[in-house]
Amino acid sequence: MSNNIRIEEDLLGTREVPADAYYGVHTLRAIENFYISNSKISDVPEFVRGMVMVKKAAAMANKELKTIPRKIADVIIQACDEVLDKGKCMDQFPVDVFQGGAGTSLNMNTNEVLANIGLELMGHQKGEYQYLNPNDHLNKCQSTNDAYPTGFRIAVYASNQKLIDAINQLREGFDRKAKEFETILKMGRTQLQDAVPMTLGQEFHAFSVLLNEETRNLHRTATLLLEVNLGATAIGTALNTPEGYQPLAVQKLAEVSGLPVVPAEDLIEATSDCGAYVMVHSALKRLAVKLSKICNDLRLLSSGPRAGLNEINLPELQAGSSIMPAKVNPVVPEVVNQVCFKVIGNDTCVTMAAEAGQLQLNVMEPVIGQAMFESIHILTNACYNLLEKCINGITANKEVCEHYVFNSIGIVTYLNPFIGHHNGDIVGKICAETGKSVREVVLERGLLTEAELDDIFSVENLMHPAYKAKRYTDENEQ
């Protein structure tokens, strides 16, 4: 063995492993076998932490049940803390996020890294597994089929909380704009046609409420991840675990993670079923749908500036065209739209992978993980990007907004209780044909007085409509 390599052995024979690597031969083979995306497990630190938490919880349970020597358990726990508390070896998880084997490559990567950290703590060299073994000690009372999905669930839950934080900050940004724009009267639109007036503040407040609904939905679905199959081992029969291990390991995981994890109701079902991932990613898809709709609205409201709605101005961030001078595009809402499309596509991936399970195991969890972590990551970044580069800098074109209101035909709807729907149709048709305002036509036809129109079309009443029509007190009154 040279200074640059060490020799390790597995089922398939011996291999040379870089001497300074904390991973071992199993990880080396995975690197060679799966060169798919150039995205590594190290790029998802929450996943690394989730797996290490599982190993720490297992070591604590094994120590208490005396299934491994106390000194070995203590070293494993200390090695886990080196990663969890100090961030040691976070770059030692080079396995591609796309991997066959239901996650065995990541499970063994974790076992090897922790074993080699532990060996150094014991005063031994990396790879001297006769003292601390990745399989016999780090993987004690575990299988990839319970360790991997449990670590995955912990990781997705933690990542989900970061996304919720980002959504809340974006929501607060919309709230600030809602307050800023609360007195700006504008035209509401349905089917892209003039409807009735509202305030720009109300429009932005609706965006905020919409996002608040999504945080509640994400919270609700994320609780499904807290039911874990740790202790199930290979297929859910708890093979090679002592009595009491499964509930104890889950209890220790709750202590280590600070999360209220609970044992799955049926370990065989939990080991093969991926329904929770479908539900959680469905919530991500729903957020993407809503967020994309908001961005569509922002692009429409800022369209122009001369031949569009031009009700709001988005921050000018970069030149918009290589041929058209002075053109500036809504690039941030556009990129958020694209993020949302990708998340919606990922949802199809998760659905198909969850369906692809066979008998007692679903081997497609790695691609579910890739899709879920990507969706959460890009949605989190998109929320911050939209807030910082767009929402915070939006300004309103008050005069344009009010011009649309007072020159619209839609405000005739306010007159329905006074002149009736049929007269409203006639007024609207005349306005459309002649270009006259609703006020002009109503006065010409003698349907209402100037004073009555002033009251009905007051800014206050247009912003906050009050019922001003007749109320009937006698049943016989016509």
UniProtKB/Swiss-Prot annotation:
Tell me one GO biological process term. tricarboxylic acid cycle
Name assigned to this protein: Aspartate ammonia-lyase
Source organism per entry reads Serratia marcescens
Q: State the family it belongs to.
A: Belongs to the class-II fumarase/aspartase family. Aspartase subfamily.
Detail which positions bind L-aspartate.
Answer: T104, S143, T144, N145, T190, S322, K327
Q: What is its biological role?
A: Catalyzes the reversible conversion of L-aspartate to fumarate and ammonia.
Q: Which InterPro entries match?
A: ApsA (IPR004708), Aspartate_Ammonia-Lyase (IPR051546), Fumarase/histidase_N (IPR024083), Fumarase_C_C (IPR018951), Fumarate_lyase_CS (IPR020557), Fumarate_lyase_fam (IPR000362), Fumarate_lyase_N (IPR022761), L-Aspartase-like (IPR008948)
Query: Subunit structure, briefly?
Result: Homotetramer.
Stretches for region SS loop: 320-329
Q: Which UniProt keywords apply?
A: Lyase
Pfam families linked? FumaraseC_C, Lyase_1
According to UniProt, the reaction catalysed is: L-aspartate = fumarate + NH4(+)
